[in-house]
């Protein structure tokens, strides 16, 4: 059958009748006049303190999200009750939709359930379902679903649609179909989103007849298809070689007021390219040109290559996508000889192109593609450009893009700006890619950038906190001798104490004294906190206590204190006032 024939055009009627009661109350009435003689002055009501209007919900949600993401749960559990937040379904749901780490999201969900006067509703439950479903934790998702049933929480079409989507995405089409039937049996009427998701699942599983029946049922239920519904139909038709029928739907949907959007056009052209349907692609490109719709960069590149292979003109494609002409020119005009000599003018031009794409268009996917091409062709970019790429990728938490740019700088022998190295270190620490931190520090030292006393000590401490004492020692060894002060030595001692190796900490102390570096208050606190727990260093503990007492009594550490001693004390002293 032809899908384009299944259309309806039912006029919508509006009633203009007014209720007689409303007409009666709409007649003009005289207002009683109050006598000034007996009128009473309004009582003064004590004004309530209004909340600070500058504190927006998005700021509250962002604060809670940062606590969940960057703190361990014990710390987060202590901070959350003291935020002064009125915990309601809206706030809880917004926090969950911000996608904190899955485990933290579940702990936060359970923590919120214990708040006095708060109960989870179907909004928060459905969001928690989505989090587990997106992570592929289908059994956990089902557990939350059963919990909803036990608690008597309303289960609506939105909840069922989410379940059907994630269950089908996991490959269990039969399970998704059972959920569909359960939804219908429970009286939940499907929406256009439900119908569309279910049809897409059936088409993908090759159940064309069932998908067709669902579409007919959708029309009989007077649910109007939207752009995504038509896109699902056209995507299936193009994949089966029925491009004329797909075009028929493409134009008829416009006649009834549904305009194909950017997502629809990109999906259709990607599908047409996959099956070599260039004529269909041309018809869609004409519509895109008339309506100002553009392609995503990867699809544009694929379309460019397909038209070139077919010997067809790409003028229309370039005209529609003039916004990415910089990328296309760069990808086509680069010398294809890998060992070609690159002069200063060419290098400057390529740097300008990359800067334009990154800083003006913020198209980081395109930048990744260009970097790979330039690495293959041995083209060297300016240091400030590669540094900007790394910093922008780190700002957006794109670890892959930042790693790609860093690897490119290594191969090309490019020394980066200090801010780029620090951004990389922070990014790799957050993503727990600790061995890469050492690579960055090595390159930073080669580029003659200094970590500094504070950052060096903090990095050593952070690697020790991640239970990687070997990496912490590597960072210490990479530091120049003039940066191996009391803060760095104390940080390394703290690493070994935490790792259960007090003998190594004492060895570091002896090495520090040999270099005539005097311990600070923080050094004594670190050593005593670890050595007091073992009976192997009783003599050393007694001596360290005596030295610490002498240091405190002399008050030398409070008056003319060296900056390194002050940093060490701020980082490691336990009761510094």
From Swiss-Prot:
Repeat positions for PPR: 121-155, 156-190, 191-225, 226-260, 261-295, 382-416, 417-451, 452-482, 485-519, 520-554
Cited InterPro entries: Pentatricopeptide_rpt (IPR002885), TPR-like_helical_dom_sf (IPR011990)
Gene3D superfamilies hit by this protein: Tetratricopeptide repeat domain (1.25.40.10)
Domain of life: Eukaryota
Record-linked PANTHER family: OS03G0856100 PROTEIN (PTHR47447), PENTACOTRIPEPTIDE-REPEAT REGION OF PRORP DOMAIN-CONTAINING PROTEIN (PTHR47447:SF27)
Family indicated by similarity: Belongs to the PPR family. P subfamily.
Name assigned to this protein: Pentatricopeptide repeat-containing protein At2g01390
Taxonomic source organism: Arabidopsis thaliana
């Amino acid at each position: 059958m032809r899908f384009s024939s299944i259309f309806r055009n039912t006029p919508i009627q509006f009633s203009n009748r007014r209720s007689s009661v409303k007409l009666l109350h709409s007649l003009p009435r005289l207002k009683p006049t109050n006598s000034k003689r007996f009128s009473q002055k309004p009582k003064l009501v004590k004004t309530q303190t209004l909340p600070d209007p500058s504190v927006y919900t998005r700021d509250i949600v962002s604060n809670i999200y940062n606590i969940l993401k960057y703190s361990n749960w014990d710390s987060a559990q202590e901070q959350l009750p003291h935020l002064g937040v009125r915990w309601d379904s809206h706030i809880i749901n917004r926090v969950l939709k911000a996608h904190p780490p899955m485990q933290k999201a579940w702990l936060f969900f359970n923590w919120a359930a214990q708040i006095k006067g708060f109960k989870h509703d179907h909004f928060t439950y459905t969001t928690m379902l989505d989090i587990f479903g997106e992570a592929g934790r289908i059994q956990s998702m089902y557990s939350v679903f059963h919990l909803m049933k036990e608690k008597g929480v309303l289960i609506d079409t939105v909840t069922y649609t989410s379940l059907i989507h994630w269950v089908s995405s996991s490959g269990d089409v039969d399970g998704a179909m059972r959920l569909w039937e359960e939804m219908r049996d429970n009286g939940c009427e499907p929406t256009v989103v439900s119908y569309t998701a279910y049809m897409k699942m059936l088409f993908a599983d090759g159940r064309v007849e069932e998908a067709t029946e669902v579409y007919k049922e959708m029309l009989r239920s007077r649910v109007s298809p939207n752009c995504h519904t038509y896109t699902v139909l056209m995507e299936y038709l193009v994949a089966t070689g029925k491009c004329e029928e797909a075009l028929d739907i493409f134009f008829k949907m416009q006649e009834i007021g549904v305009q194909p959007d950017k997502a629809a056009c990109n999906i259709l052209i990607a599908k047409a390219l996959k099956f070599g349907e260039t004529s269909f692609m041309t018809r869609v490109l004409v519509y895109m040109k008339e309506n100002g719709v553009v392609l995503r960069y990867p699809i544009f590149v694929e379309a460019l290559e397909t038209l070139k292979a077919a010997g067809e003109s790409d003028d229309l494609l370039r005209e529609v996508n003039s916004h990415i002409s910089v990328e296309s020119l760069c990808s086509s005009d680069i010398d294809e000889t890998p060992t070609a000599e690159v002069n200063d003018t060419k290098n400057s031009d390529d740097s300008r192109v990359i800067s334009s794409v990154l800083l003006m268009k913020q198209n980081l996917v395109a930048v990744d593609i260009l970097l790979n091409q330039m690495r293959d062709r041995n083209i060297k970019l300016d240091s400030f450009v590669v540094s900007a790429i790394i910093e922008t990728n780190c700002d957006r938490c794109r670890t892959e893009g930042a790693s790609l740019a860093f690897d490119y700088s290594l191969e090309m022998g490019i020394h980066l700006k200090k801010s780029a190295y620090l951004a990389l270190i922070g990014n790799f620490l957050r993503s727990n890619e600790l061995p890469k931190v050492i690579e960055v520090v090595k390159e930073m030292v080669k580029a003659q950038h200094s970590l500094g006393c504070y950052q060096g000590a903090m990095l050593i401490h952070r690697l020790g906190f991640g239970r990687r004492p070997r990496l912490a020692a590597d960072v210490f060894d990479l530091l120049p001798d003039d940066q191996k002060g009391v803060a760095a030595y104390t940080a390394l001692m703290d690493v070994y104490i935490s790792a259960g190796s007090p003998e190594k900490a004492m060895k570091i102390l002896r090495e520090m004294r040999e270099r005539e570096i005097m311990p600070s208050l923080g050094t004594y606190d670190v050593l005593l906190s670890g050595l007091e727990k073992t009976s192997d260093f009783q003599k050393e503990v007694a001596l360290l206590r005596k030295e610490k007492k002498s240091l405190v009594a002399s008050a030398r550490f409070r008056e003319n204190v060296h900056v390194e001693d002050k940093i060490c004390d701020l980082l490691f002293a336990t009761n510094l006032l």
